[in-house]
Design a protein with these regions (language model features):
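Extreme N-terminal starter segment of soluble prokaryotic enzymes
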Residues: 1-4
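Two-component/phosphorelay signaling modules centered on CheY-like receiver
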Residues: 17-26
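A short beta-strand-loop structural module common to alpha/beta enzyme folds
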Residues: 26-34
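Short amphipathic alpha-helix with an adjacent loop that forms part of the alpha/beta core around
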Residues: 34-43
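Cysteine-nucleophile active-site neighborhood
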Residues: 43-117, 181-183
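Proline-centered loop/turn at the N-terminus of a beta-strand
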Residues: 73-75, 91, 123, 142, ...
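Catalytic beta-strand/loop cores that center a nucleophilic Ser/Cys/Thr
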Residues: 112-159
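Acyltransferase
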Residues: 172-189
């Protein structure tokens, strides 16, 4: 399997790439503004990395989702997760408290196979100041994990093989991060 990681100019991207490679997968990293959309045809899956700012400021990030939704499996992490939400009609909202290097607990619903084999209670390493809003969440998106404060920590598209996680699976603050990535890599829809 060969996956592409769309690098949204984030220092965590290569930690994510290293973890995915350690799971036995070939990885190519492309900066979000340094490729042609057609180049992604060569890859089996697309991983949308964390990054600063908001999705509309992240190069071709939204175009990748628009072009490959329903054609390629995708996983969005942090900014990538927010971009998935926004692309399908969700709103983003700023948090009153910024999370940077904070581990919080929450629940995963058990419906998303990326959480297969994990307990209902999970610990998530968080590095963000925005979340996908619950208000007006479109029907095509399903919440699959939330923080104890009720913030969306994971979602999936009901029709397409697209998953998003707000937290960082590559962080030491996410004990089950490798298992989540392994589950996603092993998914075939």
């Amino acid at each position: 399997m060969h996956i592409v990681i769309i690098d949204n100019y984030d220092s965590f991207t290569y930690n994510l790439a290293h973890l995915v490679k350690s799971l036995g997968v070939q990885v190519t990293v492309l900066r979000n503004d340094r490729f042609a959309l057609e180049e992604l045809e060569a890859f089996d899956k697309i991983l949308l990395s964390p990054g600063p700012g908001i999705p509309s400021e992240a190069g071709l990030l939204l175009d990748v989702i628009r072009t490959y939704a329903g054609r390629k499996p995708m996983l969005g992490v942090c900014l990538g997760h927010q971009a998935i939400g926004e692309m399908f009609g969700a709103r983003l909202e700023t948090l009153s408290d910024v999370f940077h290097g904070v581990a919080t607990e929450g629940n995963q619903s058990g419906v998303d196979p990326i959480f297969q084999g994990l307990p209902e209670r999970i610990v998530m390493g968080r590095y963000h100041s925005w979340v996908v809003s619950r208000d007006g969440l479109p029907d095509c998106l399903e919440i699959t994990a939330e923080s104890d404060a009720g913030q969306i920590m994971a979602l999936r598209h009901r029709e397409f093989d697209i998953h998003g996680i707000q937290f960082h699976p590559e962080s030491v603050l996410t004990p089950d991060g490798a298992a989540i990535l392994r589950n996603w890599l092993n998914l075939t829809k």
